[in-house]
A protein has these predicted regions:
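Histidine/acidic-residue-rich, glycine-tolerant segments that coordinate divalent metal ions
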Residues: 1, 7-131, 141
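Metal-dependent amide/peptide-bond hydrolase catalytic core
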Residues: 93-205
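Short N-terminal signal/transit or membrane-insertion segments
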Residues: 2, 13, 51-72, 162, ...
Length: 205
């Protein structure tokens, strides 16, 4: 807010025409606050926009970033005693492992820059019984939305393969995160030059 107030005073002093706004973004890292602002028309009349993020490290001008998609996956099976009658069960944990293995092998067919991570949320705690429920999360990121969409189809095939191979059922939901950032190098260079002029240490790059 202080920088915004100073900017307005500078515009008055040097007779710079235009409108300057300071826009706060709630829950922007986890739930896409900027996306909601964009859909709400907040940036419709904006010619240039600069995002500034606080850091505990040395300042830097950010470059490109990946766009992403996040999945919540739930496998449902049939519980049974793991030692007495395991054949009576349908192991949701095995379905999850099958999914993870399929994704791991699928990575070989993805383009450079694709990143995939996954983990258990529920259903991995107990032993001694065939697990009838497992919940997972899976995140993927790629340089462009088109690559994300291509990888999503492959990931969903892996998710469904886990269910098909074990006789379980599966529910999953994939939600797009932010799209990739396209940096403005001219604006970034001006920002860097002004930071250096004010004595602010800057990381290279």
């Amino acid at each position: 807010m202080g920088a915004g107030a100073a900017m307005i005073e500078a515009m008055k002093k040097f007779d710079i025409k235009g409108t300057f706004s300071v826009i706060g973004t709630p829950y922007e890292e986890t739930d896409g606050g900027k996306i909601d602002l964009l859909k709400g028309g907040v940036f419709d009349d904006v010619d240039a926009c600069m995002a500034v993020h606080p850091t505990t490290a040395m300042s830097r001008v950010a470059g490109e970033c990946l766009c992403s998609c996040h999945y919540v996956i739930e496998y449902h099976g049939q519980t049974a005693h793991a030692w007495a009658r395991p054949w009576k069960g349908k192991n949701a944990f095995d379905a999850a492992i099958m999914c993870f293995n399929a994704v791991a092998m699928m990575r070989q067919q993805t383009e450079d820059g694709v990143r995939i991570d996954y983990g258990f949320v529920e259903g991995y705690e107990q032993t001694g019984s065939v697990r009838d429920y497992v919940k997972l999360t899976l995140g993927l990121a790629a340089p462009t939305p088109m690559i994300v969409e291509d990888v999503r189809k492959k990931v969903e095939g892996c998710i469904e393969a886990g269910a098909a191979a074990t006789g379980c059922t599966v529910e999953y939901h994939g939600e797009m995160g932010y799209k990739n950032r396209i940096p403005n190098s001219v604006l970034g260079d001006f920002f860097r030059e002004n930071c250096v002029a004010l004595g602010e240490p800057m990381q290279p790059g």
